[in-house]
C-alpha cells in the first residue's frame, strides 16, 4: 500500500490526493474527504491549530496502517493543516483507494473518525478580538 501522511502550514490543493492515488486501474474505487474550518455560530474569525511535530505524523501513520490492513487498501493520503486559518479554509484531506467502493468508504470514514479523536492537535479560536483555547 502506498501511503502519504503529512502536516503542513500551507493551503491544501483539492485535486492533489486523487491525482496522487491514481494507480492505472488497480483500484476500482477512490474516496476523498475534505474538511473545512467551520463557524457554526457566526462568531469565529480565525482558527489556529498547533501540533507536536513527529508525534502527530506517527499517530496519523498508525491510523492509516490500521485502516490499510482492515480494508486492504491500495493507497491512502492524509494531510492535515496547522497554523492560522479562516472559516471555509480546507483543514484536512483524507483519501483512500481500494479494489471496491464499500472498503474505500468505510476506510475513509474510519481514518477520519480516529484522526478526530487520537491525533494530537491543539486549537484555539479567534472570537471578538481574542484567542480562546478549545
PLM region spans:
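Phosphate/diphosphate ligand-binding glycine-rich loop within oxidoreductases
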Residues: 94
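N-terminal, polar/charged subdomain of small-to-medium soluble alpha/beta proteins
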Residues: 1-90, 98-109, 113-134
